[in-house]
Amino acid sequence: MRLATDLETPRRVAVLSVHTSPLAQPGTGDAGGMNVYVLQTALQLARRGVEVEVFTRATSSADAPVVPVAPGVLVRNVVAGPFEGLDKNDLPTQLCAFTAGVLRAEATHEPGYYDVVHSHYWLSGQVGWLARDRWAVPLVHTAHTLAAVKNAALAAGDAPEPPLRAVGEQQVVDEADRLIVNTEVEAQQLVSLHNADRSRIDVVHPGVDLDVFTPGSRDAARAVFGLPTDQKIVAFVGRIQPLKAPDILLRAAAKLPGVRVLIAGGPSGSGLAQPDTLVRLADELGISDRVTFLPPQSREQLVNVYRAADLVAVPSYSESFGLVAVEAQACGTPVVAAAVGGLPVAVADGVSGALVDGHDIGDWADTISEVLDREPAALSRASAEHAAQFSWAHTVDALLASYSRAMSDYRARHPRPAARRSGRRFSMRRGVRT
């Protein structure tokens, strides 16, 4: 048996995030949990002495080519296609240009500069596949979501994922040296839907910043947004799109007189076509006087959103994990979530909140009411205790183990001279070779 101590730790990792930048504001456009994941894991890796370069597509002429984020972490904005107006479904046409930008950046380093390529989402996997072959290093891939899973649980008005994506995902699954998933459910989906080799899959739970997302004064948090202190508040945080199902919360709230709804997020995906849909729905349901809409919030303000709420609802039709659920619980706020994907892991049913099977409005209203009636102090403590197990430090422990396995297995299959890893070390802190 190979011991963990026998495994090699990478010096540098090239992280690919084609369609969305880790520096983008979550809750806007295509920015969401994946952005948080990429940024937080990069920061944690750097704290362990692993240098990280994140490659993402530039979306503005104002984007600097290289952005130092923290010691050991760089974001490279690669020019590939028009800066604005390019839909995510059109990005496959720009993968050649993006790949060229990535390879050119690597060519400025000495051979063997990166030890691992980690791609996020299938678009990045296509680029990572080529980079892996060019650089002779292992490819680790995180899908985050799968087309087949999303298409099997489409919400009304949501657009199905294109066949091109399903084909691309299969190619990446076949080519990746290791596959990282959020939960065992996702691992089984890769096996059943894409015939993935289970021995190449590592389950790595995402985390939460337990130094930022902490319990605090509910009244003080409500004062930040001018919210009343004498009403029960149920919050929704995330992108406004059919997949996330914020309409389910509004319809359930219509059956719960006295409950106020707080929605924080911006339109995304199919929701971009009708950004005012929820506002109109609240009017139609006659609850517009007890619904507050907020734009996407910074992390610091998001903490106040969670603290202000008595409960956070996550009614998604599909969710590979559910970072919002864990962030809310870390703030001591219980969660009512759909029993889909990774949410049964993110939420401890009956302990830190409740899970709802399906999207029947009556079931959602009843479950929200039942959780709101529980003893709040005990529920808040249980929520924070459950979230405490999901730290980014734990995530990176598992991530490093996966990287090490990928490197060891790759070297066993593709021996190369030790000189490949030699050469001058590059300091991302100063941007020069040393």
UniProtKB/Swiss-Prot annotation:
Region of interest (Disordered), residue spans: 414-434
GO biological process, one term: mycothiol biosynthetic process
Catalysed reactions listed for this entry: 1D-myo-inositol 3-phosphate + UDP-N-acetyl-alpha-D-glucosamine = 1D-myo-inositol 2-acetamido-2-deoxy-alpha-D-glucopyranoside 3-phosphate + UDP + H(+)
This enzyme's EC code(s): 2.4.1.250
Positions contributing to UDP-N-acetyl-alpha-D-glucosamine binding: 25-26, 33, 239, 244, 297, 319, 327
Sorted UniProt keywords: Glycosyltransferase, Magnesium, Metal-binding, Transferase
Keyword check for DNA damage: no
Residues noted as binding Mg(2+) in the record, renumbered to the chain: 306-307, 309, 333
GO molecular function: acetylglucosaminyltransferase activity; D-inositol-3-phosphate glycosyltransferase activity; magnesium ion binding
Pfam families (UniProt xref): Glyco_trans_4_4, Glycos_transf_1
Annotated binding of 1D-myo-inositol 3-phosphate, by residue: 19, 30-35, 88, 121, 145, 165
UniProt cross-references to Gene3D superfamilies, sorted A to Z: Glycogen Phosphorylase B
Signal peptide segment: none
Superkingdom of the organism of origin: Bacteria
Similarity section: Belongs to the glycosyltransferase group 1 family. MshA subfamily.
Oligomeric and partner information: Homodimer.
PANTHER family documented for this protein: D-INOSITOL 3-PHOSPHATE GLYCOSYLTRANSFERASE, GLYCOSYLTRANSFERASE
Function: Catalyzes the transfer of a N-acetyl-glucosamine moiety to 1D-myo-inositol 3-phosphate to produce 1D-myo-inositol 2-acetamido-2-deoxy-glucopyranoside 3-phosphate in the mycothiol biosynthesis pathway.
The protein, known as: D-inositol 3-phosphate glycosyltransferase
Organism listed in the record: Mycolicibacterium smegmatis (strain ATCC 700084 / mc(2)155)
